UniProtKB/Swiss-Prot annotation:
Keyword Metal-binding: yes
Gene Ontology, cellular component aspect: cytoplasm
Protein's UniProt name: Urease subunit alpha
Residues holding Ni(2+) 2: 219, 248, 274
Top-level class of the enzyme under EC nomenclature: hydrolase
Keyword presence, DNA-binding: no
Organism placement in taxonomy: Archaea, Methanobacteriati, Methanobacteriota, Stenosarchaea group, Halobacteria
TM ranges: none
Native organism: Haloquadratum walsbyi (strain DSM 16790 / HBSQ001)
Documented EC number(s): 3.5.1.5
Catalytic activity: urea + 2 H2O + H(+) = hydrogencarbonate + 2 NH4(+)
Intracellular or extracellular location(s): Cytoplasm
SUPFAM superfamilies, alphabetized: Composite domain of metallo-dependent hydrolases (SSF51338), Metallo-dependent hydrolases (SSF51556)
Gene from which the chain derives: ureC
Length: 570
């Protein structure tokens, strides 16, 4: 016997379906579901009197060895940079995405996908009405505090690349012994990690020994001297070893100007950190590098989005971060040269155009670990308010093109740049089951569940002595996947191919799986999903700092109010 449900009644029971729109948090962004994989009337739902019972939505007698899922997250709305915006069931086996589609019991339900069979060995975290996104990546982290890992997970970030300590300011771990210690320390946390070595050396041997010790990439920082010779040496070694090079260029233009750095890079792939320049880099024109295919640009979150407070906050942050003395005029001039309202205003617009491809934190060296995802969506909201719908969204009553552009900035694009997109960055089948589940009203700021390697590691959770999980205070807390040996089974440490082939994990006693980065030297701007725009003509006026693209002034007004802010964090 069938029953016809109104669209509203269906949504209350099973969540939104094809053609429905969801508002993301308290932003102005609307996501429209492009496809629903479900079979109406045969939805897999867990609970008393629901369908996920033996012989109904759960196939009797089917073992995990025979193909039953380990986990199913049913009836989720998926927002993914590759898959788009869909509704479906997410199946997990052996810590990986088994598929997205229709899950259930093929004996009793129509349309069940072969790889999404629910059996007695299948567990669930009901995702009805929730939004699922890939675990976020932050590939610009200063590992100065061990609490960063908890803040990352609580915000939806499951992969962390960076370095420590480097004076606390340079995003690199210096020397083979220090790299090994950081790799060992990271075993304590249920995240994917990778550590950058110091690439500032005019000779190759010190760089090579760090790569062989387990570094996943190289970092060039002006505080260690980002000279043309250093840049050339690091890139030469990186090309031989297949690791990425990240660069913080010379703010003071002491060892050369932007043109000299460009010449030293010589067409080779490089990740340009905080490309706007407030975080550091050739003043005032480092932003011009976004116009080249081999330059892979990212922003750091302190300057995103541009608000009425951005300029004043940054000046003090630069002084502290780079050990500058406010009583020394030259130090003050150094800080002031980096903070330019005009280029910060242009940064928002260039993100919205898809010319800046990634968002990162720069945690504890001006940026905030837990705000990568939040500030990405605040920027998307601000740009819709100020620039209107993107051309691809006009006439759709939704913002799908803009949403895909922005979610790619902290998922698939940094995964490609880091050389780990085979493993993370999207919810494509075969990748790690790093999944973040959000209630739509809390999207972008407070995840409901964080799944790492197919197992819950963090979630909203009430008082442990309460009668229910919902007993106040409900707050972000660790789950069982974050403790014991489970955290090793669900996490991955990324190292260079040389270190992987030399069994660095066994050498230093790592229990987490170790995998090599690869393909870092062939990636270009054209590979940046939804963010591949490379302006042919971008100019920064050396006097006014105004930014022009193809002769048109690129700017925006500072925001006085933002979504995903005090309303959620009182």
């Amino acid at each position: 016997m069938s029953r016809k449900l109104s669209r509203e009644a269906y949504t209350d029971l099973f969540g939104a379906t094809e053609g429905d729109r969801l508002r993301l948090g308290d932003t102005n962004l609307l996501a429209k579901i492009e496809k629903d994989h479900g079979t109406y009337g045969d939805e897999a739902v867990f609970g008393g009197g629901k369908t996920m019972r033996d012989g109904m939505g759960m196939q009797s007698g089917t073992t995990q060895a025979e193909g039953a899922l380990d986990w199913v997250f049913s009836n989720a709305v998926i927002i993914d940079p590759i898959l788009g915006i869909q509704k479906g069931d997410i199946g997990v086996r052996d810590g990986k995405i088994a598929g997205i589609g229709k899950a259930g019991n093929p004996d009793t339900m129509d349309g069940v996908d072969d790889e999404l069979v629910i059996g007695p060995s299948t567990d669930t975290a009901p995702a009805d009405g929730l939004i699922a996104t890939p675990g976020g990546l932050d590939i610009h982290i200063h590992f100065n505090s061990k609490e960063l890992f908890e803040h990352a997970l609580a915000s939806g970030v499951t992969t962390m690349f960076g370095g420590g300590y480097g004076g606390g300011a340079t995003t690199c771990t210096t020397g083979p012994e220090n790299i090994k210690r950081f790799l060992q320390a990271a075993e304590e946390y249920p995240v994917n990690v990778g550590f950058y070595a110091k690439g500032n050396s005019s000779g190759p041997d010190p760089i090579i020994e760090q790569i062989e010790a387990g570094a996943c990439g190289l970092k060039l920082h002006e505080d260690w001297g980002s000279t043309p010779d250093v840049i050339d040496t690091a890139l030469t070694v990186a090309d031989e070893e297949d690791v990425q090079v990240c660069i913080h260029t010379d703010t003071l233009n002491e060892s050369g100007f932007l043109e000299d750095t460009f010449e030293a890079i010589d067409g080779r792939t490089i990740h340009t950190f905080h490309i706007e320049g407030a975080g550091g880099g050739h003043a005032p024109d480092v932003l011009e590098l976004i116009g080249y295919d081999h330059m892979l640009p990212s922003s750091t979150n302190p300057s995103m989005p541009y608000t009425v407070n951005t300029f004043d906050e940054h000046l003090d942050m630069v002084m502290v971060c780079h050990h500058l003395n406010p009583d020394v005029p030259e130090d003050v001039a150094f800080a002031e040269s980096r903070i330019r309202s005009e280029t910060i205003a242009a940064e928002d617009v260039l993100h919205d155009m898809g010319a800046i491809s990634m968002m990162t934190s720069d945690s504890q060296a001006m940026g905030r670990m837990a705000e990568v995802i939040t500030r990405t969506w605040q920027t998307a909201h601000k740009m819709k308010s100020q620039r209107g719908a993107l051309p691809a969204d006009r006439g759709t009553d939704a913002d799908n093109a803009r949403i895909k552009r922005y979610v790619a900035k902290y998922t698939i694009n940094p995964a490609k740049v880091a050389g780990i997109n085979e493993y993370v960055g999207s919810l494509e089948p075969g990748k790690m089951a790093d999944i973040v589940l959000w209630e739509p009203e809390f999207y972008g700021i407070k995840p409901k569940y964080v799944i790492k390697g197919g197992f819950p590691v963090h979630s909203e959770m009430g008082e442990a002595n309460g009668s229910l999980m919902t007993c106040e205070p409900v707050m972000q807390r660790s789950r069982m996947g974050a403790v014991g040996k489970a955290k090793h089974a669900i996490s991955t440490t990324f190292v260079s191919k040389a270190a992987y082939e030399n069994d660095i994990g066994d050498q230093i006693g790592l229990e987490s799986r170790v995998r090599p980065v690869e393909g870092t030297r062939d990636v270009g701007k054209n590979d940046m999903r939804h963010n591949e725009y490379a302006p042919e003509n971008i100019d920064i006026d050396p006097q006014t700092f105004e930014v022009a693209v193809d002769g048109e002034h690129v700017t925006c007004e500072p925001a006085e109010e933002l979504p995903l802010a005090k309303r959620y964090s009182l």
